């Protein structure tokens, strides 16, 4: 048995304008080749690969569905997969739009195939990995989507809320458009085109080092009646974090996905969501169906550990139950059951009158990891708990939960003694930040209950069971995190089973990893802000000579670094205020708007994206670190230009284009031919990021050439051009991802034509500015120059994390002004001569 991939050759340019760029496959586990023509007959599921992903990634889930179908029967599933040629969709908004458009075309063609085969199939289930999940949701918002053709979307490690990279302005627009469409539809209950849509979003947790798991949450986009967000380590029978790529082939997870796929077929919204909650939520779930029990011979339960219940009905109020009745490992929908045949059913009942119970809903098994593959089922309820025990077989513990609230010190941690009950629920009201990880030590208790810890918070379905290893568990939760809509209060809760003393301390190494995952782009935008601030220092140093970048950096560190750190703390605090955020969004260029469903959510997408104390503490640390990065990049660029300068002959003298030259004739210089050619290519073929990279390379060579001239009168200009060289080199990092998309298109699609980024205005001023530097002109400082440098620095500071692409445009604007000031100086001097 192997997996065969059969191309759907009928999907041509007649059905999609992108058919020559992308393709569609039917995937099937079979000992034979798939016969042609392809005649699908099952339930269609379409796999959408993510960034640099392959259509072949669906193999594992497809094979698991086949195994379950052969074992238990049910509807056969036909898996289709899209081949996007492993495009970098996470880096390029236009690529996302193209993939979403082709996805809709593929859906329409698949449904037509079923109709041609005499099958009444009206919709396709989508399974998206990484950016494939974003493409799946984006496709619903496009004009070529036919309503009702998609009703269920599974997404794995998909960053729904925040793009993983903000180096492209188009991708920001795509995210805003997509999320605004979904939010506005669910906000308008009378005209909701998504009323029959259900979405599942699964994150890999801390082991996913590609996409921060906080970005997968659908809470602020899709209401809980239509969407579920969860983590792999919260899912029954998975119980572990999963690497980004492994989300598609991890055995435990793909089995649960296959179970869900087979059980959501032909169900309405409520039925699909019930399946999602039972299989994936990691929290206690109830059936939607209610039933009443009349005249039940019921016995009140007694609190106590390690007791056995005879056959019959029992009830309790506000109690918690633990039992070693296990759950059939082959199904997620069975009751608590022993291999000997004894059965335990649990119900949550809304009311009790005598021996009658009203509004009872079945409590589905909640599983936690156990030793030797044993499983403990756990049920708790805030109403009446009704138990139906078929026979006395094994022990059941029934007790109330002990509640405790604990303070926490970030230096010394906290130690709590648990009570002599089944479990103790410890809340930490001040621990709300998802950026901090902890280590929890649990001493041996005296209970007969095996020790383990349940960790949960009120944000999404972040509930997991942790079994201590040598008495220690690692705790990291998804509380208040930067740039993601969050509830005002989402503290950490630990429920400790088995008694003993609990000690919790900060995991500093794990916390550093959390910071790096969330602030990778900040370490590009914040050094940019500091570079522009240092450039401002150079213009206002008050010396006759233009200072070198090393000298001005030293001045910045000695005079302004402490002030900058304090200012960073103040800015972090101010951006936590909604009034300040509203004002900064009002003056933001470009203006971004978001449409929120629930007013209880707060979103801070400025500076560090944090509110409260954490931002004021992190701001100085990041400022110092970014200053160190500026020193490092300065030394690297200066070292490179010094090395290149040795390649030029020392006897070569620079051409003496005097500042008194006619500026009109300057424009007619032969180097303008190169600028003209590049401009035409940008308009027709190349992204402007390539032109910027070429200009940076030319500037590096020019800087090295001028450095070979040791004339004292040229030192100021050498310092000036060196600063520009460092700025452009750093800005190239912003442009590199889009450039990588273009190069990948050349390699895979054999086409040099790019689908976006042909705006000549975004690059022509920079090209002319670099060309003008060959005339060795230093523009004079002015108040407007200072204001522009200050604005560019502050823009990088406030908006750089979420709009890194604007760093390029900020430099382009500065280049425009410096170019004008350079020629103004020439005209002014010519006039006086």
Curated annotation (Swiss-Prot):
Give its E.C. classification number.
3.1.-.-
An example molecular function term from Gene Ontology annotations:
phosphatidylinositol deacylase activity
Kindly list the biological process annotations in GO that this record carries.
GPI anchor biosynthetic process; protein transport
Residue ranges annotated as transmembrane are 521-541, 560-580, 617-637, 672-692, 723-743, 787-807
Q: Which Pfam families match?
A: PGAP1 (PF07819), PGAP1_TMD (PF25140)
Q: How does it sit in the membrane?
A: Multi-pass membrane protein
What positions does UniProt annotate as the active site of this protein?
130
Q: Which residues are glycosylated?
A: 191, 456, 772
- Keyword Cell cycle in record: no
Main location, first listed in the record: endoplasmic reticulum
The UniProt entry, under InterPro entries, shows: AB_hydrolase_fold (IPR029058), PGAP1-ab_dom-like (IPR012908), PGAP1/BST1 (IPR039529), PGAP1_TMD (IPR056824)
- Where found? Endoplasmic reticulum membrane
Keyword list, A-Z: Endoplasmic reticulum, Glycoprotein, Hydrolase, Membrane, Protein transport, Transmembrane, Transmembrane helix, Transport
What are its GO cellular component terms? endoplasmic reticulum; endoplasmic reticulum membrane
Superkingdom, natural source = Eukaryota
Glycoprotein is among the record's keywords: yes
Function according to Swiss-Prot or TrEMBL: Involved in inositol deacylation of GPI-anchored proteins which plays important roles in the quality control and ER-associated degradation of GPI-anchored proteins.
Q: Which family does it belong to?
A: Belongs to the GPI inositol-deacylase family.
Q: What more does the entry say?
A: Lacks the C- and N-terminal parts of classical GPI inositol-deacylases and may not have GPI inositol-deacylase activity.
The entry's protein name is Putative GPI inositol-deacylase C
Organism expressing this protein natively: Yarrowia lipolytica (strain CLIB 122 / E 150)
Give me the gene this protein comes from. Answer: BST1C
